[in-house]
Structure formats: C-alpha cells, structure tokens
C-alpha cells in the first residue's frame, strides 16, 4: 500500500486526531469529512476499532502498510511488551526524531528534509527516513542547510523537546539520549488494539 500524500486534514478528521500536531484541523470541523454537522460518529465494531487504531498510529508516523507491518513483526521478536516495543521502534525513526527535535513542523516535512540530504547522523549524511536511530547517536542539520528558512521557522515555532532527546540550537544538533518510556509516547494511542488487529 502506497503512503498517503493527500491533505492530512481529511485523515485527521476521519480518525478524530490531529496529525499536524497543531489541532487546528479539528477545531473548525471536529467531525468526519462527508458528515454534515457535528452529529455522533457511527459506532464501530470491535474489528473497526482495532483497524481505526492501527490507521491512527500508521498515519501519525506517516508509514506505509508494508513498513508498518514489518516494524510490528520486528517488535514481536523483542523482549517486553509487543505494543510498547512497536511504538518505541516507530519513535526511533530518523524522520520522527528530526520532527521531535523541532527541526521540522510536521513529520512529513521532516521526511522531506531527510530525503533531500539535509540531515546527518554521527557526522554522515543519511537520506533514509526510516533509518533507526540508536541511543547515543547525534542528529544534526548539514552545515550547508542551516540557513534553510523552513528549518529556521520550525525552530522558532518549537517550544518543547522530549526528555529522551537533548538539543543544542546553536549547533542545530541533538542527541537521542535514551529510548523513550511508554508514558512519553502518544497517549491517544491504544497499542493493545493494534496487537489484537494483527493477531486475528
């Protein structure tokens, strides 16, 4: 399944969560597209709830179905809780950490920065958004890319860095200091439903 490249507000409204991180797309019309007015969302079956939760997490991180399933299966081979490990692996993606560091305003924008070669990891250019960053590795903006307006605007707008990251705004460099705990990951996701979905 190809990655969705259409307007994110449509997906946000359909799933009932903000994928932009701003929440603006839900403020004006907090109901699904095609529904005329803020009536009740139709009640979902157990399968429907599981599918919706999977789609919420998949679209949140901007991952296509093949990558999503592959990461899920990899998480199942790790010690500990399957769902929690799955979310930690998604959080460790390079494009996501570029976004978390405030170098991009959205994950989609972060993915473009990585793909276009503006990001380096431990001093080497990495242009693979799904690259898995390990604790202790540094993520920085290439020196030639530090004057990009899109990065400057993102840094000016950002006012929060998660505790599992450190960031030096002068160097435009951050470090993935440790793996995140479940309490530091998206609270609006019930990963147990996703485990149930793939266990059917």
Swiss-Prot record:
Source organism superkingdom? Bacteria
- Supply the Pfam families for this chain: Ribosomal_S4 (PF00163), S4 (PF01479)
SMART domains recorded: Ribosomal_S4 (SM01390), S4 (SM00363)
Biological process terms from the Gene Ontology for this record are: response to antibiotic; ribosomal small subunit biogenesis; translation
Instruction: Give every S4 RNA-binding domain span.
Output: 92-152
Question: Does the UniProt entry include the keyword Acyltransferase?
Answer: no
Its annotated function is as follows: One of the primary rRNA binding proteins, it binds directly to 16S rRNA where it nucleates assembly of the body of the 30S subunit. With S5 and S12 plays an important role in translational accuracy.
On assembly, the entry states: Part of the 30S ribosomal subunit. Contacts protein S5. The interaction surface between S4 and S5 is involved in control of translational fidelity.
Q: What is this protein called?
A: Small ribosomal subunit protein uS4
Q: Which organism is it from?
A: Geobacillus stearothermophilus (Bacillus stearothermophilus)
The uppermost taxa in this organism's lineage are: Bacteria, Bacillati, Bacillota, Bacilli, Bacillales
